[in-house]
């Protein structure tokens, strides 16, 4: 399958210029069309009024009952000679032409090609193309006339109840047509010039209107990794850009938070690894500074092995968290009885709990949940290890399990010194410790709770912590 070549969308300036110019030019042409149509209707009304005046004058002559036909025609010719740009034809009741304008063809010969006049408002008015002839124009001299507006009407004395004549009157409209054509040409030329001006003005206006966008772009370009605390002021941009600026501020805030976490994380991991490496180097240098017995060398090796094991666990935990960060932590789910899983964790920590004089107790139902058994046991182990670390001798750690509204809630509760409220939101951060001075006194690597959160989130659940004088409670909620 051949992929289509990438086609970059038109710029905003181009699109805005096109649509605004198109709308403006369309409006101008609509105005021009209305003007031309109005002029046509006005000329049609003017011509019809002229035709009606002429027909009324001729009717008075032709309707006179006491005149002979010869007398009527003589009077008709005298009247017609006073009109310019008008052709007359008179037919009797048998359809024979008894009179037509002298020096001109009989217009009745052209009536078969007549078409109704759409611009005429009311009445039977027709348009004729022909005859073509030279006649006086509205100015000086003569001009060619070939387009006519015509009416016909019965006139003359009544015979058997019907007029004896049919009168045809045609008025030249060439001057009006020439005027309309000139007007259209001028409007087209004006429209062309105006269109060019509109495009230029719109381009200039769009360029000017995009100035705030360019200003915002320059401000964004000036932000570097050292300026992540900089925020754009939404009050200094047009309202259309306010949401964009707010979204950018939110994004840069998240980037700053991630960048800060990453920097702190790098510093913390360097510190965590530096200490055991320093211990290894120091112990090895001491061992090599003089001859040692086999027992002393074995003690050094065992101590080094302990530090290396701790470092290996830390690296494993960090790889686990890296998978979680990249959404690569995919649980292999199956139906589990959480009571059984808690029991397995209790078996693992039973000896340590006895040494510390702490009792482990499970309270609740046999909650069923779909989850990865290894991951969930690891999360429970981290919470229980944390609880054992801070529970006074003679106290009891309680793990509760219950199902509420299709959700499984697991609570690990231990008595002890309450945690200050300002520390609670950060307990699940990597390497965060409430008391930094205790970090090298067997207090773990500081990422156990971060692993708990990653596992719970991978199971589409949530984890929270509360602490007061009665103790500290970690609550995991998972979908049943």
Swiss-Prot record:
GO terms for molecular function: ATP binding; phosphorelay sensor kinase activity. CDD domains: HAMP (cd06225), HisKA (cd00082). This is Sensor histidine kinase CusS. Autophosphorylated. Its EC number is 2.7.13.3. Residues 268-480 form the Histidine kinase domain. It catalyses: ATP + protein L-histidine = ADP + protein N-phospho-L-histidine. The keyword Cell inner membrane applies. It comes from Escherichia coli O6:H1 (strain CFT073 / ATCC 700928 / UPEC). PROSITE patterns: HAMP (PS50885), HIS_KIN (PS50109). It is an enzyme of class 2 (transferase). It is a multi-pass membrane protein. One of its GO terms (cellular component) is plasma membrane. Pfam families: CusS, HAMP, HATPase_c, HisKA. The modification Phosphohistidine is found at residue 271. Keywords: ATP-binding, Cell inner membrane, Cell membrane, Copper, Kinase, Membrane, Nucleotide-binding, Phosphoprotein, Transferase, Transmembrane, Transmembrane helix, Two-component regulatory system. Residues 207-260 form the HAMP domain. PANTHER family: SENSOR HISTIDINE KINASE CUSS, SENSOR HISTIDINE KINASE YKOH. It is found in: Cell inner membrane. The keyword Nucleotide-binding applies. Member of the two-component regulatory system CusS/CusR involved in response to copper and silver. Acts as a copper/silver ion sensor. Activates CusR by phosphorylation. The chain crosses the membrane at residues 16-36, 187-207.
């Amino acid at each position: 399958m051949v992929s289509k070549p990438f086609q970059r969308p038109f710029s905003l300036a181009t699109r805005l210029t096109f649509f605004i110019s198109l709308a403006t030019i369309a409006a101008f042409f609509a105005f021009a069309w209305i003007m031309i149509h109005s002029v046509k209707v006005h000329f049609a009304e003017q011509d019809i009024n002229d035709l009606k005046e002429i027909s009324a004058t001729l009717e008075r002559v032709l309707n006179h009952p006491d005149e002979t036909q010869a007398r009527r025609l003589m009077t008709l010719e005298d009247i017609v000679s006073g009109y310019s740009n008008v052709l007359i034809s008179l037919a009797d009741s048998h359809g024979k032409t008894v009179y037509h304008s002298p020096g001109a063809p009989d217009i009745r010969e052209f009536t078969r090609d007549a078409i109704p006049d759409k611009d005429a408002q009311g009445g039977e008015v027709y348009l004729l193309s022909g005859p073509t002839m030279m006649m006086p124009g509205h100015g000086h001299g003569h001009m060619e006339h070939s387009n006519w507006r015509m009416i016909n009407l019965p006139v003359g004395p009544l015979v058997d109840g019907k007029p004896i004549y049919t009168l045809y009157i045609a008025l030249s409209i060439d001057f009006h047509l020439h005027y309309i054509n000139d007007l259209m040409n001028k409007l087209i030329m004006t429209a062309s010039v105006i269109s060019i001006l509109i495009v230029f003005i719109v381009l200039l206006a769009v360029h000017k209107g995009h100035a705030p966008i360019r200003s915002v772009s320059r401000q964004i370009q000036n932000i570097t990794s050292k300026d992540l605390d900089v925020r754009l002021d939404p009050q200094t941009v047009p309202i259309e850009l306010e949401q964009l600026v707010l979204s950018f501020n939110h994004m840069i805030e998240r980037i700053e938070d991630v960048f800060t976490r990453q920097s702190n994380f790098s510093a913390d991991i360097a510190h965590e690894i530096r200490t055991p490496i320093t211990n290894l180097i120091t112990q090895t240098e001491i061992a090599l500074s003089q001859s040692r017995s086999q027992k002393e060398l074995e003690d050094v090796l065992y101590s080094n092995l302990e530090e290396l094991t701790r470092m290996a666990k830390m690296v494993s935990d960090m790889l686990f968290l890296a998978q979680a960060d990249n959404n690569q932590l995919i649980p292999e789910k199956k139906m589990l009885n959480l009571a059984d899983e808690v029991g397995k964790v209790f078996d693992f920590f039973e000896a340590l709990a006895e040494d510390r004089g702490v009792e482990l107790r499970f309270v609740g139902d046999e909650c069923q949940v779909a989850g990865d058994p290894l991951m969930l046991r690891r999360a429970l182990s981290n919470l229980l290890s944390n609880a054992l670390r801070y529970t006074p001798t003679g106290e009891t750690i309680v793990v509760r399990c219950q199902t509420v509204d299709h959700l499984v809630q697991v609570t690990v509760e231990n008595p002890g010194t309450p945690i200050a409220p300002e520390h609670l939101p950060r307990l699940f951060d990597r390497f965060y410790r409430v008391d930094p001075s205790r970090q090298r006194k067997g207090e773990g690597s500081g990422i156990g709770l971060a692993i708990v959160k990653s596992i719970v989130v991978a199971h589409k659940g949530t984890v929270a912590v509360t602490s007061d004088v009665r103790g500290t409670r970690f609550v995991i909620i998972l979908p049943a």
